[in-house]
């Protein structure tokens, strides 16, 4: 490639290190290009080979998860979201992703853009979002910084979701010292589409036009993917410009324009510009289609003066899409987006050479092989060193007999203390900031239902959806904790009257270069896989968020599960936890071989009343769990159950108390 006249910094190994690349990765890049990269090319490689985009430290482990099922219409990771056939010619697109690092430095915008980004993943596939969920983790509420983060995150989720017009119907909030300084903000979206009317994130057809549509591009979010691929430190506050800024009203326009364009048949391929922006969408679409692209990025609508091609390619400005369409459909495509008062600018066209070529006022500033950049192609894949953490010997050696017995006189005060602990207490302050009823499809929302139930209009069917994970269990027993995370999410869906179909996941862990962290990661994923196979809930995709650490240490390993279930008849089968009538019989449904065990390890009782995180996760057998869930679902469908509530945080005492309170 000829030298450019554009004034860019000379690329050196030291500059590559500053971009988060290792010495080996820099050497691979130079070898593949056959020359020293340009500054723009370095930026492209650094974000595409970041952990956030390449999954280089996790993909080998993720491939061990069950990723096939009769109802799955696309494989895990093949599209922007998972797609599940629910019958009657309908499919559900759903996905969960993290926005942890942005929310740690700018909680309002970090959380808001997390909501916006996951919605785009859904409607980019042609599905209309029908509900949102979230899963949140914070440090103790007596810390002013934690209260600031908590308030900002909840307001960000509420303001964006409410303005966008999709109900936030379910979620979970946990507090623990391990999350202090590094909150977890996981956002999930669910949408419905007719089978056969979906769009794909692919670039095909030599000569087809490539358009950028939606908002103008600014400097917000540059290197956001790289920022998400490193530990949070005192220097992270200086990376506030790496946090994107969202506009839910523009996103609403983009939703309608995108769905109209897909229905009009003018879209060959389309992808949201999320992490790494134009770089990621152009490279991934090209690689998937075995094609290339020629992009003239000076044509990108810009909202800031003096932007460089490096900045334009790496910007993560929100509410933007990359669209491929046939030349004969360009006028229609432009008319649709302009009708919705959105930009639609032609950047170039699809080529057959497999390379993404970036031009700046006619000058070639980047020429990179798409396949070499992407996950599943030439992006690095690492198998990290593992070591069983020493702390597990200490926690496993804990003797529950050292915990004082609870006197009868102290039982009621202890229950009240449990009910008042932040992890069990009502989250009404949170969900009252969310519009849970917009679009009028919410049958069971936050509060008395173990999972949310959302009606599919024009059908008797509904969707039961839930996010769930007990990070304390995973910390104490990673494999069993991973199993329980899947099982409890499925159990919640069953308690609401739904049949679990599939999961999406958001795997929140510490630094993968630490052998103990990677051992826990592999064990937890192994447990998840075992539970998914046993319960028949394949993995449709999701997200890995590493580097959730701060100067005080790593967060609890938190593999958040987003569970999708189908309620065959929302009027007859939807079930809540609230007791319905005096005189109803209260039963504890359990395996036939069940016996009482002193399962206080990792319990909220130990944590809230004794300040302890110790012992083993509760006794758990997958076959028994499956039998209980199948039995309960059968009883609900037979009309024999008036309410159902799973026994989890706080045990049977809290379970019964909550059913009374909900009544």
PLM features per residue range, with description:
Residues 1-663:
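Glycine/proline-enriched, intrinsically flexible loops and inter-domain linkers
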């Amino acid at each position: 490639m000829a030298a450019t006249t554009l004034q860019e910094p000379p690329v050196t190994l030291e500059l590559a290190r500053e971009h988060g690349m290792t010495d080996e990765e820099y050497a691979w890049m130079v070898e593949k290009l056959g020359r020293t990269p340009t500054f723009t090319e370095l930026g492209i490689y650094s974000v595409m080979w970041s952990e956030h985009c390449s999954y280089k430290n996790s993909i080998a482990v993720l491939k061990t998860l069950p990723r096939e099922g009769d109802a799955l219409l696309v494989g895990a990771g093949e599209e922007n979201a998972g797609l599940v056939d629910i019958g009657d010619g309908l499919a559900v697109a759903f996905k969960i992703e993290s926005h942890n690092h942005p929310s740690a430095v700018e909680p309002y915008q970090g959380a808001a853009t997390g909501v916006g980004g996951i919605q785009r993943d859904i409607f980019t596939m042609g599905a209309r979002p029908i509900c949102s969920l979230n899963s949140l983790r914070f440090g103790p509420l007596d810390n002013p910084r934690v209260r600031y983060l908590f308030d900002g995150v909840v307001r960000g989720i509420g303001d964006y979701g409410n303005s966008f017009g999709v109900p936030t119907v379910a979620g979970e909030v946990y507090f623990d010292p391990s999350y202090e300084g590094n909150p977890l903000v996981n956002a999930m979206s669910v949408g419905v589409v007719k089978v056969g009317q979906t769009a794909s994130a692919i670039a095909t057809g030599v000569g087809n036009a490539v358009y950028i549509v939606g908002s103008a591009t600014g400097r917000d979010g540059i290197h956001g993917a790289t920022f998400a691929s490193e530990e949070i430190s005192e220097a992270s506050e200086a990376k506030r410009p790496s946090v994107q800024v969202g506009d839910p009203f523009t996103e609403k326009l983009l939703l309608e324009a995108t769905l109209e364009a897909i229905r009009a048949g003018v879209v060959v391929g389309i992808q949201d510009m999320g992490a790494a922006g134009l770089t990621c969408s152009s490279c991934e679409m090209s690689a998937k289609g075995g094609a290339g692209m020629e992009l003239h990025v000076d044509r990108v609508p810009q909202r800031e003066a003096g932007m460089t091609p490096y900045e334009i390619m790496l910007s993560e400005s929100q509410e933007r899409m990359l669209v491929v369409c046939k030349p004969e459909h360009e006028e229609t495509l432009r008319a649709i987006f302009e009708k919705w008062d959105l930009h639609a600018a032609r950047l170039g066209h699809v080529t057959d050479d497999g390379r993404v070529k970036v031009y700046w006022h006619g000058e070639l500033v980047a020429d990179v092989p798409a396949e070499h950049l992407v996950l599943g192609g030439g992006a690095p894949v690492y198998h990290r060193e593992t070591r069983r953490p020493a702390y597990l010997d200490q926690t496993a050696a804990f003797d529950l007999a050292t915990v004082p017995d609870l006197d009868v006189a102290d039982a009621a005060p202890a229950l009240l203390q449990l009910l008042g602990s932040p992890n069990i207490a009502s989250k009404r302050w949170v969900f009252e900031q969310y519009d849970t009823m917009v679009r009028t499809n919410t049958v069971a929302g936050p509060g008395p239902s173990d999972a949310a139930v959302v009606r599919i209009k024009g059908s008797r069917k509904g969707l039961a959806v839930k996010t769930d994970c007990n990070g304390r269990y995973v910390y104490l027993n990673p494999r069993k904790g991973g199993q329980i995370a899947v099982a409890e999410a499925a159990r919640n869906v069953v308690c609401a009257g739904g049949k679990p179909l599939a999961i999406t996941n958001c795997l929140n862990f510490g630094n993968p270069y630490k052998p103990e962290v990677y051992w826990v990661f592999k064990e937890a994923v192994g447990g998840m896989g075992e539970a998914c196979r046993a319960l028949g809930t394949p993995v449709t995709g999701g997200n890995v968020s590493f580097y959730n650490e701060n100067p005080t240490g790593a967060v609890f390993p938190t593999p958040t599960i987003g569970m999708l279930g189908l309620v065959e008849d929302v009027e007859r089968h939807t079930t809540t936890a609230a007791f319905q009538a005096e005189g109803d019989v209260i039963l504890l449904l359990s395996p036939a071989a069940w016996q009482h065990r002193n399962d206080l390890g990792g319990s909220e009782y130990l944590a809230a009343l004794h300040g302890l995180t110790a012992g083993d996760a509760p006794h758990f057998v997958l076959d028994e769990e499956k039998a209980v869930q199948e039995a309960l679902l059968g009883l609900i469908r037979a009309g024999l159950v008036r309410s159902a509530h799973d026994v989890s945080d706080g045990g049977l005492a809290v379970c019964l108390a909550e059913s009374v309170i909900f009544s």
